[in-house]
Amino acid sequence: MGQKINPIGLRLGVNQTWSSRWYADSGEYGRLLHEDLKIRSYVMEELKQAAISKVIIERPHKKCRVTIHSARPGLIIGKKGADIEKLRHQLSEMTNAETSLNIVEIRKPEIDATIIAQSVAQQLERRVAFRRAMKRAVQSAMRLGAEGIRINCSGRLGGAEIARMEWYREGRVPLHTLRADVDYSTAEARTAYGVCGVKVWVFKGEILEHDPMASEHRATRNDNSSSSLNRRRESV
């Protein structure tokens, strides 16, 4: 079962938590969920070059708080904070609520599954050989501290007539072990031959305590142990 299911969904409530953190009445739930999907789609589309890993949405009373985890926070903030103010204003119009923005810098994008998947997909679109792209990503992740990584690429790889799936793995990626901190993400590469899919699993070690926020706390601790602190900006 662990081989098929989404590793993050399998570990929700164990050492992973949700990206949307709010409660709502049954009458409002559908509207707010659809709003969350629109926010994430808009942010990922508008800030493609900012290497965004995840967008966390919280909804305190009649407000909306959006936290963007990015490897390039400077592209989001802009000169003197002009770009982040524009983004905050646009999100406020989408939600019809007072919106605040937090930007969290990812210090080690080489071991973030979402950023790895996006990078491999972008290389495939630029006609880089898929084996070279996968191997480069795997080597970078292992060098930066990942205990294991697996990358799958599927589709008409290299312009082949018949679609197939190729994968590359290094280290160990325990998908059945619930205490394993496994990051997972997917991406699509729109090539001249059709769409190629990219899947990435990154094993970062084991989390022994039962804490749904444990994976996020571990990432934060790793970032704070770096030579420079995370750059954060909040606009209210």
UniProtKB/Swiss-Prot annotation:
GO CC annotations?
cytosolic small ribosomal subunit
Q: Where is this region: Disordered?
A: 214-236
One Gene Ontology molecular-function label: mRNA binding
The regions listed as transmembrane in this protein's record are none
For this protein, the record's SUPFAM superfamilies field holds:
Prokaryotic type KH domain (KH-domain type II), Ribosomal protein S3 C-terminal domain
What is any one GO biological process for this UniProt entry? translation
Give UniProt keywords alphabetically: Ribonucleoprotein, Ribosomal protein, RNA-binding, rRNA-binding
Q: Which residues form the KH type-2 domain?
A: 39-107
Show the InterPro entries listed in the entry.
KH_dom, KH_dom-like_a/b, KH_dom_type_2, KH_sf_prok-type, Ribosomal_S3_C_sf, Ribosomal_uS3_bac-typ, Ribosomal_uS3_C, Ribosomal_uS3_CS
Family matches, as Pfam families: KH_2, Ribosomal_S3_C
Q: Which HAMAP family match?
A: Ribosomal_uS3_B (MF_01309_B)
Tell me, in a sentence or two, what this protein's role is: Binds the lower part of the 30S subunit head. Binds mRNA in the 70S ribosome, positioning it for translation.
The similarity comment for this entry is: Belongs to the universal ribosomal protein uS3 family.
Q: How does it assemble?
A: Part of the 30S ribosomal subunit. Forms a tight complex with proteins S10 and S14.
- Please state what the protein is called: Small ribosomal subunit protein uS3
